Amino acid sequence: MRYVVHDKKYHFKFAFDTETGAYVRTGILDENGKDTGVDPFMGSYPHLIDVGIMGHCIHGKTGLCAKAGIGCYQSGMLVEQPNMSVDDFRWIAEQSKGRCNQFALGGRGDPDQHEHFEEILKICRKNNLVPNFTTSGYGMTPEIAALCKKYCGAVAVSWYRSEYTLQAIQMLLEAGIKTNIHYVLGNNSIDEAIDRLTRNDFPKGINAVIFLLHKPAGQGTRANMLSVDDPRVAQFFAQVETRHPFKVGMDSCNVPGAIRFCTSILPESLDTCEGGRYSCYIGADMMMVPCSFDQKKRYEVSLRDMTIEDAWNSEAFERFRNRMRGACPGCEKKELCMGGCPLMPEIVFCDSDKRYVKEEEK
């Protein structure tokens, strides 16, 4: 199904295809409905909500994440909290019907291990929301894969370089599911990424490899951060531009790098940090933040006290947005990258002398 929504508050339209996941936005529309070519800064409601249904992680407790070189930003090896209740999830979904396109199910653990996983997927579809999620694959079964085929738009498997990783990918592919690989790109993994892209060495049949930039949050260390002046970063983005038998994508945290190093990627296809502009994160504890990497809870708002729309328009979220609004005023590429990550400026792949990081409002 395809649909178009008119955001009357910010004067633009967006379209979404529930089958393919295709998503497009117009520019700001003038009084005659003509596209001005100016990108709208934000929507009146998040178009994608990262719903952290998991409060604890079976996979993380085994230590296998750390063994694979992944520093869990949610500290899944250390923190144990209750999973999100079905009633809380339904409350989120019912508010989002007709306003939000997708729910990215996540949190501190594998969403497919939630005790009410099937019911959660059904609630999504009942409210015209497409559920997607990322899994370690550790607990994947043919029965879970069948549920994914029935309800999900796509499933991503985290690249843990383990037998269960490959088994989960194969299980999902055999079930006919659009399957992606999520690959955390850090100092300890970029050489492998370049090598695998050079040799097209990812499982046959996958839809895409999505590269997620390592951040120093939770168990993630600063030592594993990449720097813009590391020559391997330029080599990596050169491979991103090369044709492969699978699609290559990236999270918005990597967009400044694509702007800096890529020459053949259409700027219109890039969307920089959408936190607080087109997306947000809601944890199992019903705390809402512009981005799930706000592990210091600088911008959190409790949904026990207000609706999602109220939280979206809160002072905390506005403080987050103002960091992007005030970034890099003298740079001609400001509208494309908005200064990059407002939470961790140190991860941004930019070496421009026009770079300016707006100080956080108190």
Question: What are the residue ranges of the model-derived segments?
Answer:
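Flexible mid-to-C-terminal extensions adjoining Fe-S/redox cofactors in radical SAM and related proteins
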Residues: 1, 7-10, 20, 45, ...
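Flexible, acidic/Gly-rich N-terminal and inter-domain linker regions that tether
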Residues: 1-50, 54, 67
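A C-terminal junction/extension of Radical SAM enzymes
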Residues: 1-10, 14, 208-296, 336
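Canonical Radical SAM [4Fe-4S] cluster-binding loop centered on the CxxxCxxC motif
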Residues: 40-87
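Short, intrinsically disordered, charge-biased short linear motifs at domain edges
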Residues: 47-52, 56, 60, 256-262, ...
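The −1 position to Zn-ligating cysteines in a subset of zinc-ribbon hairpins
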Residues: 56, 64, 68-71, 272, ...
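Flexible, glycine- and charge-enriched loops at secondary-structure boundaries
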Residues: 79-86, 110, 226-230
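Radical SAM/AdoMet-radical enzyme domain recognition
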Residues: 86-216
